[in-house]
């Protein structure tokens, strides 16, 4: 792998400064963290499946996953306060760039009928979120080891509050956005 962090520092920053007309290099947008999360849904009651989901995310991210718990009880969903409802991993620095590079170069091309990720995942504050339907696109996941097939949400948090600047940053980093029709 070619080192996405070096690519960002050597090439992306200069292109961003030119295209966004930013003179101060400290004001250039940068990727701060990537959060990978899974909601267990109907499998929340089964702790073995929850452990398997957390283990799968840990394999994908290269860092131990945290099991998330419900903040309050919701009778309609049969959830009690403190009950395990999902798992998440927050990646920063070297692991963040390694994961992003693996996602762009290896995993997303393995998605069937892939035409790019949606441009509609920006939240208005410079953060981008998209979902993946199956965890099997990652090379670390072995089909025989998973108990249940699940997707995941991937959130990329940037240092800018502007969606246009965040889009330009992610596009220059190599995220394959879908073409506008």
Curated annotation (Swiss-Prot):
MF terms in GO:
rRNA binding; structural constituent of ribosome; tRNA binding
A Pfam family the protein falls into: Ribosomal_L5
Q: Which InterPro entries match?
A: Ribosomal_uL5, Ribosomal_uL5_bac-type, Ribosomal_uL5_C, Ribosomal_uL5_CS, Ribosomal_uL5_dom_sf, Ribosomal_uL5_N
GO biological process terms, alphabetically, are:
translation
Recite the UniProt keywords alphabetically: Ribonucleoprotein, Ribosomal protein, RNA-binding, rRNA-binding, tRNA-binding
Provide one Gene Ontology cellular component: ribonucleoprotein complex
- Indicate yes or no for the key word Transmembrane: no
Q: Which domain of life is it from?
A: Bacteria
Q: Which family does it belong to?
A: Belongs to the universal ribosomal protein uL5 family.
Q: How does it assemble?
A: Part of the 50S ribosomal subunit; part of the 5S rRNA/L5/L18/L25 subcomplex. Contacts the 5S rRNA and the P site tRNA. Forms a bridge to the 30S subunit in the 70S ribosome.
Function, as annotated: This is one of the proteins that bind and probably mediate the attachment of the 5S RNA into the large ribosomal subunit, where it forms part of the central protuberance. In the 70S ribosome it contacts protein S13 of the 30S subunit (bridge B1b), connecting the 2 subunits; this bridge is implicated in subunit movement. Contacts the P site tRNA; the 5S rRNA and some of its associated proteins might help stabilize positioning of ribosome-bound tRNAs.
Its protein name is Large ribosomal subunit protein uL5
Tell me which species this is from: Helicobacter pylori (strain P12)
Which lineage? Bacteria, Pseudomonadati, Campylobacterota, Epsilonproteobacteria, Campylobacterales
């Amino acid at each position: 792998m070619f080192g996405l962090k070096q690519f960002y520092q050597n090439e992306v920053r200069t292109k961003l400064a030119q295209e966004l007309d930013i003179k101060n290099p400290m004001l250039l947008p940068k990727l701060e963290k990537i959060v990978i999360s899974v909601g267990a849904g109907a499998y929340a009651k089964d702790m073995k499946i929850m452990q398997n989901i957390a283990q799968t995310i840990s394999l994908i991210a290269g860092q131990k996953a945290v099991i998330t718990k419900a903040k309050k009880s919701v009778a309609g969903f049969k959830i009690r306060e403190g009950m395990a409802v999902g798992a998440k991993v927050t990646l920063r620095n070297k692991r963040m760039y390694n994961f992003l590079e693996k996602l762009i170069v290896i995993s997303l091309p393995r998605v069937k009928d892939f035409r790019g990720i949606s441009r509609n995942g920006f939240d208005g504050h410079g953060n981008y979120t998209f979902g993946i339907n199956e965890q099997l696109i990652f090379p670390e996941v072995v089909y025989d080891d998973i108990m249940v097939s699940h997707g995941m949400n991937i959130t990329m948090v940037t240092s800018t509050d502007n969606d246009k600047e965040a889009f330009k940053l992610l596009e220059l980093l190599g995220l394959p956005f879908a073409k506008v029709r």
